[in-house]
Amino acid sequence: FDFNNISDIFEETTWENALDLACDGFNNIKSKLGPNALAGFGCAKGSNEEAYLFQKLIRTGFNTNNVDHCTRLCHASSVVALLEMIGSGAVSNQVADVTEAEVIIIIGSNPTVNHPVAATFIKNAAKEGKTLIVMDPKQVEISRHANHFLQFKPDTDVALLNAIMKSIIDQDLVDENFIKNRTKDFKKLKEHLKDYTPENMSKICGISTEKINEIAKIYATASASIIFWGMGVSQHIHGTDNARALISLSLMTGQIGRPGTGLHPLRGQNNVQGASDAGLI
């Protein structure tokens, strides 16, 4: 393509000319500076097919793995923890499962604003008598519908969640059968949590010992408990540890793998999960 023939103003041209211009420009960069001088940043609001084709273009056309999309900032920390602990970097169930839950926990998320459809499911479930527990450093809108609102101090997610797990252990509320048959290294977790008593962590996270013990019992003894979390948990210096704590909480009580239970990281855009699964990362 003759770059000298490019006009200073917009003018109509053919698809062939436009594509030649784009391709030659990329090829010039690749030949002069190498393939890693190029990168592609995709979109999580496209389809799975679009995500697959885009990453294929970058990897096979540009010959580089410099491809990414918003999940790197979004739930990358959650995906790491989920892959590490349950072998799947995806939600375990759909939002509509709140209709079968007895207890719903939302932490680090403002679904009324960011996930209005999901928020409607959750609000309707609360109106029908499901127990809604909201944990957040700020008073998000959905907390108005909550039976329990834990406004903990910023950056103390792990302290609060570890205290809840420690309380569950101390109250003998763990699911021994689930732990024996479907998990490993519970003894290591138990040892790790020995100093994270509700009394000690209450001073750090700002939630009373009594409330921590109450929430622990409500979550662990429910017939079905489900956890939702958002950017407040994942876009954090301790994001992976935050997610690990939530996953451990679910596993130690057997609150996963049944209708109305599970782990659901609320994605930042409508097809983050699909784009990630299609290789756009």
Regions inferred by a protein language model and the residue ranges of each:
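Short, intrinsically disordered, charge-balanced linker/junction segments flanking boundaries
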Residues: 276-281
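Cofactor-pocket helix-loop regions in the catalytic cores of large enzyme subunits
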Residues: 1-271, 275
